[in-house]
Amino acid sequence: MEDFAQVYGLYPEKKYNKVSYTNIANMILTLCGEKGLTEYIRRLVFNILVGNGDMHLKNWSFLYPDEKTPVLSPAYDLLSTAPYLPGDNLALTLVKTKQMDLCTVDVFKALARKANLPEHIVLSTMKITVEATRDNWSTLKKKYTLRSKNNFCH
């Protein structure tokens, strides 16, 4: 496994610097094709939706199943930083912003343009991910809602 700080030749302390989500998107399309790009956009959108401000370079990785061709590793470190860091921003820049609440369809259109990505893949993946996350959350929130502190220890 090779995390993206290693891919870009950066020391771990630079995991929040030097590279943007736009750079990563272009690299993934180049190395992993449309399938890899679709998965990357899916994860990026999901992390924005759940408020994960910690998707830095060491939380994205490649695996090399044939020892030479990279594929995105399974997702890991998916969490919401929002409850712990109100107002938290993205770990890396997405087009010209780190503010999650500014990550609109227009930002993803700009991502497609800047990174030379197929816009239809970016936008359709974004739409599908938003809908799936909302649909699943309405079902799952009943199961995973935090208990009140009064009955948590009982």
Question: Residue locations for each model-derived region?
Answer:
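Anionic ligand-binding catalytic core segments
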Residues: 1-57, 61-154
